[in-house]
Amino acid sequence: MNAVEIQGLTKRYGAITAVDSLDLTVRQGELFALLGVNGAGKTTTIKMLSCLTRPDGGDARLLGRSIVSDAAGVKRCIGVSPQATAVAPNLTARENLALLCGVHGLSRQETAARTEELSRALGLEPILARRAGKLSGGWQRRLSIAMALIARPEILFLDEPTLGLDVLARAELWDVVRQLKGRITVILTTHYLEEAEALSDRVGIMKDGRLLALGTPEELKRQAGCDRFEDAFIAMVREAGR
């Protein structure tokens, strides 16, 4: 069964078409990267798939549930770590996790167990007692991902997960994302070429709201006739602009 099936998905903002008749399939258990420069339509696509904004055309089915006709069902099976981390700055990391556990209806005992489980998995133990607003960008992003995983989603969206992080924090977060590969379906957006190449099973390259190319990093290099993924990306984007 496919995790995500997108058909003709379209979003307009006035005269601007942010996503233009997107067709795409993501397999269950896959780590899929949407890659593109700023304004390519990546974040808008994630917002539609996570039912944060309604499409103007087309539809998508997540594990068989329509984002148009069954948004509530979609939301029950997904987790989202947005580009701007949605942590409560005045609460500690532990309190942020507990807050989300409460939102999802977990008991006090379940909350304690889930907090311990996620803290151990994502290495959050050193910062559990610290206020989220005082944490570095890397720690805030880890906390945001942990919060997105509380309800054990089958599909996880990571929108620009390493944006603004330094080299070390990015490498550490890559390790966190790699732990999720094969366990759940992960869809991440990024404009970092090396991130898409290092982490993803397949990559979709977007430009101006359209899907230019789709395949594994190796397949995309072969399609473009390039030895380096960066060169393949540049060649495909430039060709589309002609």
What feature does the model see in each segment?
Residues 90, 131-138:
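Conserved ABC ATPase signature
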Residues 98, 102, 109-127:
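Conserved ABC ATPase "signature" region
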Residues 58-69, 73-74:
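Conserved ABC transporter NBD signature motif
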Residues 152:
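Conserved catalytic motifs of ABC-family nucleotide-binding domains
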Residues 214-215:
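ABC ATPase "signature
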Residues 156-160:
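Catalytic Walker B motif of ABC-type/P-loop ATPase nucleotide-binding domains
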